[in-house]
């Protein structure tokens, strides 16, 4: 696992340089969920693949930008599932974007997730990593190395409300939930980049991020293996809670396909309790 952690630091620095000077153009290809790929998405994916090819403990890679699992070492232990550049369409307006990683043992199942990480490319280059303990927060220093800053802990109740999806497609239940949060004094914080929005809630020690089921995406839009579960792991290890709107945890999800999606909610315990009160 230490070798994977060190590789994530290398990847962070390489993708950070690409983000600074990238060609923002689109390719002529779509990924598995129908999104037209940006050249920067493809470049970020190739950087990650190249670095993990150097590690003998990595069995295979599963990426948002790859249709199928890419086997590297059949007898190895770890499967890396990742979104190479979450929020890439926001690079041209200079918003913070990020990379998300889930490290699974032997097979992609919720119960096999052993570690998770994300990298955020903003004014500063930062990374959060957990191997099952409290998430650790790192920041790149002037000497070119990542320094440990602190462990992350969510308070029982926050103040931030980051809610995604197009409002006209929300269910009435979700409208009621979001309205109840605003009535309590919650502040809207939503950039359109999952990494940036979830990072802000962690840094501010509480709140909720939601991407609900909608009329146009009844099974949600975010991908279970390489977006949802890695962040669920981080949030729950930080003392928070998660749900798909029905379950007590996103870890109750049974994964049947690589690019499976789900509605998802991540937050402090209070906000997830309120979710269940209103969703039923």
From Swiss-Prot:
Q: What catalytic activity does the UniProt entry give for this protein?
A: beta-D-fructose 1,6-bisphosphate + H2O = beta-D-fructose 6-phosphate + phosphate
**Assigned EC number:** 3.1.3.11
Q: Which UniProt keywords apply?
A: Carbohydrate metabolism, Cytoplasm, Hydrolase, Magnesium, Metal-binding
Where along the chain is Mg(2+) 1 bound? 64, 83, 85
Positions annotated to bind Mg(2+) 2: 83, 86, 227
- Compartmental location: Cytoplasm
Residue positions binding substrate: 86-89, 190, 221
Mind telling me which SUPFAM superfamilies this protein's record contains? Answer: Carbohydrate phosphatase
Q: Which GO terms describe its biological process?
A: fructose 1,6-bisphosphate metabolic process; fructose 6-phosphate metabolic process; fructose metabolic process; gluconeogenesis; sucrose biosynthetic process
Q: Which GO terms describe its cellular component?
A: cytosol
Q: Which PANTHER family match?
A: FRUCTOSE-1,6-BISPHOSPHATASE-RELATED, SEDOHEPTULOSE-1,7-BISPHOSPHATASE, CHLOROPLASTIC
List required co-factors. Answer: Mg(2+)
Q: Determine the domain of life of the protein's source.
A: Bacteria
Q: Name one GO molecular function term.
A: fructose 1,6-bisphosphate 1-phosphatase activity
Query: Which pathway does it take part in?
Result: Carbohydrate biosynthesis; gluconeogenesis
Q: Which ranges form a coiled coil?
A: none
Name the InterPro entries for this protein: FBPase_C_dom (IPR044015), FBPase_class-1 (IPR000146), FBPase_N (IPR033391), FBPtase (IPR028343), SBPase (IPR023079)
Family indicated by similarity = Belongs to the FBPase class 1 family.
Query: What is said about its interaction partners and assembly?
Result: Homotetramer.
What does the record say about how the cofactor binds?
A: Binds 2 magnesium ions per subunit.
Q: Which organism is it from?
A: Campylobacter hominis (strain ATCC BAA-381 / DSM 21671 / CCUG 45161 / LMG 19568 / NCTC 13146 / CH001A)
The identity of this protein, by name, is Fructose-1,6-bisphosphatase class 1
Q: Mainly localized where?
A: cytoplasm
